[in-house]
């Protein structure tokens, strides 16, 4: 019992630390707005994600309370905290299963996909070369794929719709997805998903998740525009792709194949 309570206490205190940092981040956005570069906001947000994992508060409590423990492990108190810890564990398992089910859907969808046409693969390899990506990345098409997306940490894969696209439109989509890969957004989204699983009880944890997703897209757009050359053409293509996804539940890219 004591071990489970200690684990939950460390997780709870790390949630408090991460949440305080997130409030600071929101204050920066409100009062400084465009005075700080987007990449700085994104970097701070990534540090906040890590803070939700680091039990800094738990360690400080033990250091400054004479190597003792802030909670009294006797009688009713330990029983109450044990019950709370069990409730947290049940919620964490349920959230993991929920994300796991989404991951399973993507893996199943991958089995339904097929290799792209040769000219698409050539364009894909040219874009990879231009972005300086050497790792082998699979590119597939599927009839159930509505919008381009990237999935996989160990075996990264880019999924494209079957519909024929103009070469410039196709390049824009590929640049966008490969930029996500180059920026390690799949990894960070995986970190964010695990954060939600651990801190599911926190009312604003999904807001942190959404902000990480939004800023990943912002930084990706700013980076990809440089390869496309025209901001207007880039955002026109992105807008058209997003319109096609209306009413369709897009799968997240944090998948561990």
Predicted feature descriptions by range:
Residues 2-257:
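Membrane-embedded and juxtamembrane structural elements of multi-pass membrane proteins
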């Amino acid at each position: 019992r004591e071990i489970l309570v200690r684990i939950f206490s460390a997780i709870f205190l790390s949630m408090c630390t991460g949440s305080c940092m997130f409030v600071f981040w929101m204050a920066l956005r409100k009062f400084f707005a465009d005075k700080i570069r987007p990449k700085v906001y994104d970097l701070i947000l990534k540090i906040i994600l890590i803070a939700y994992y680091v039990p800094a508060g738990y360690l400080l409590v033990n250091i400054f309370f004479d190597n003792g423990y802030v909670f009294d492990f006797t009688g009713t108190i330990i029983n109450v905290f044990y019950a709370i810890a069990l409730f947290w564990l049940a919620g964490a398992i349920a959230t993991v299963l929920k994300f796991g089910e989404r991951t399973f859907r993507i893996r199943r969808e991958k089995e339904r996909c097929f290799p792209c046409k040769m000219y698409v693969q050539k364009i894909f390899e040219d874009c990879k070369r231009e972005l300086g990506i050497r790792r082998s990345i699979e590119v597939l098409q599927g009839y159930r794929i509505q919008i381009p997306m990237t999935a996989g940490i160990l075996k990264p894969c880019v999924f494209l719709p079957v519909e024929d696209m103009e070469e410039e439109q196709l390049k824009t989509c590929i640049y966008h997805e490969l930029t996500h890969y180059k920026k390690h957004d799949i990894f960070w989204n995986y970190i964010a998903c695990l954060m939600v699983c651990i801190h599911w009880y926190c009312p604003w944890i999904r807001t942190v998740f959404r902000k990480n997703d939004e800023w990943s897209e912002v930084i990706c757009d700013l980076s990809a525009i440089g390869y496309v050359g025209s901001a207007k053409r880039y955002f026109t293509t992105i807008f058209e792709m997003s319109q096609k996804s209306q009413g369709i539940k897009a799968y997240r890219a944090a998948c561990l194949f």
